[in-house]
Amino acid sequence: MAESYLLEKLKSVEQTFNELTRRLGDPDTAKNPDEYQKIAKSRSSLEEVVETYDNWKIAQEELIGARQVLKEANSDPDMHEMAALEVKELEEKIDYLETRLKVLLLPRDPNDDKNIMLEIRAGTGGDEASIWAGDLLRMYSRYADTQGWRVKLVSESLGEMGGFKEVILEIQGESVYSKLKFEAGVHRVQRVPATEAGGRVHTSTATVAIMPEVDEVEIHIDPKDIEMTTARSGGAGGQNVNKVETAVDLMHKPTGIRIFCTEERSQLQNKERAMQILRAKLYEIKLREQQEEVTSMRRSQVGTGSRSEKIRTYNYKDSRATDHRLGQNFSLNPVLEGDLETVIQSCISQDQQERLAELATSSAAG
């Protein structure tokens, strides 16, 4: 039988769902398109919970019937065997539905539906680290393509031998943060660099930060804390190149965060873009502090988002990508080609199990 806290929550969700369904059918609601859309979205977010709860209730009724048949079939071995099998199958189905309901009722991360800024910084390993940062950029761009997301380069600092010392992408689409938040941390590569004549295996790293996009209301920046200079933006040649100062070099004095933006066409656009990146960076710092508090309580293995956490090692010699949080190996080439869905879904699943265990502990204590 499901825990009482779960049943209470499910009854409450069902009542809310029925009320939203009633309001959608109200002619007055239909007159206000914004209100109608808002209610429809709220109702849609509860649909899977209510459907799963209905299936659970049906399975409970069927189980009562199957147990009754089992009780009455003692004199008929064949009927007894069939009824016993049905009871077993229904009990397994109910267990599965209860676990699914618990997952569906876990509190949603308020940032899950947000677009993101994805920052990759070359770490230890010199030129090879910059090349590795470029490989990660390609991996995430390809993964974004498979998801139907839009990717735009917003800031870059090129490496001397290729790749990037630092690069920031804007990624927009459905559920971007909910999936890519598990990619934050240190990505380590072990391979023979193209720059290495001796053929020795080197270890290099790059750090990935996942920053949900935020508006001015969520993160307020005091203009007095900003120091901004302009510079001439490099270009592909022609009459106007380097004559107009469109590039923006922005410094946030309290944190020392510095952003250089050249990708947009005008100085105003570059300033707006730099402020957008700064807001995302400040929000990510705030989130990280909150997550570290939660992590110290949960001792979570997945999704802490810590920049210093080594999350994955890509070993070229063994054609293996090892995710250290999961303790699992994946085939290297598909991962580098952007086939990240299996890895990310495994991280999501482990995070859910961790949170379910926490929920069970707190419910037992309560």
From Swiss-Prot:
Give a short account of its post-translational modification.
Methylated by PrmC. Methylation increases the termination efficiency of RF1.
**Where is it found, in Gene Ontology cellular component terms?**
cytoplasm
Q: Where in the cell is it found?
A: Cytoplasm
Answer whether the UniProt record assigns the keyword Protein biosynthesis to this protein: yes
Any one GO MF annotation of this record = translation release factor activity, codon specific
Pfam families in UniProt: PCRF, RF-1
What InterPro entries does the entry give?
A: PCRF, Pep_chain_release_fac_I, Pep_chain_release_fac_I_sf, Prokaryotic/Mito_RF, RF-1
Taxonomically, which superkingdom? Bacteria
Modified sites of kind N5-methylglutamine = Q239
* Record key words, sorted: Cytoplasm, Methylation, Protein biosynthesis
UniProt lists the family membership as follows:
Belongs to the prokaryotic/mitochondrial release factor family.
Job description of the protein: Peptide chain release factor 1 directs the termination of translation in response to the peptide chain termination codons UAG and UAA.
Q: What is this protein called?
A: Peptide chain release factor 1
